[in-house]
A protein has these predicted regions:
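The conserved 3'-phosphoadenosine-5'-phosphosulfate
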Residues: 36, 46-131, 139-147
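Generic structural signal for individual residues within well-ordered alpha-helical segments
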Residues: 2, 26, 73-74, 134
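Active-site glycine-rich loop that binds ribose-phosphate moieties when present
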Residues: 43
Length: 147
């Protein structure tokens, strides 16, 4: 979730001229709603659970997809009832890089730096929700690093 917050802020900062600085992450209502709230995975998951039963939903983390693209794509294809052949979806067994930073008119934005206070505040907000999400999707609570 912390890396997702960084990525989302960089994406938004590269497109939105008046995007607040990263140190305003929890002070800016716009950043808090758009970036931090979007990182409350269990809360987001539950919004879909109101409409769809658990067996009709599949959760794959970015880490799983990046580390094991073939296995993850086969799992996705099988889940949707498609033939689990992902050979045409990958480039030399890896996910294709199609949306490089700076493409589509976005500025190249450097990775932000967390102050210790900001990082701890963000962790205090998102970690309990993240752990509920991990438990509800059958993953260990130490799936994500918080350092």
């Amino acid at each position: 979730p912390l890396r997702r917050i960084e990525s989302h802020w960089r994406h938004w900062r590269g497109r939105i001229n008046d995007c607040p600085s990263f140190d305003q992450l929890l002070r800016s209502p716009r950043l808090r709603q758009r970036i931090v709230q979007a990182s409350l995975y269990h809360q987001q998951w539950q919004r879909y659970r109101r409409w769809f039963p658990q067996q009709s939903m599949l959760s794959i983390t970015t880490e799983e997809l990046s580390a094991h693209p073939q296995t993850s794509l086969r799992r996705i294809l099988s889940f949707i009832g498609a033939t689990p052949d992902c050979s045409r979806l990958l480039e030399e067994g890896e996910l294709p890089r199609m949306n490089l930073a700076g493409s589509k008119g976005r500025q190249e934005i450097s990775a932000p730096t967390w102050s210790e206070g900001l990082k701890q505040e963000a962790i205090d907000i998102i970690r309990p929700d993240s752990e509920r999400f991990l438990a509800s999707t059958g993953r260990p609570t130490n799936t994500w690093e918080w350092v």
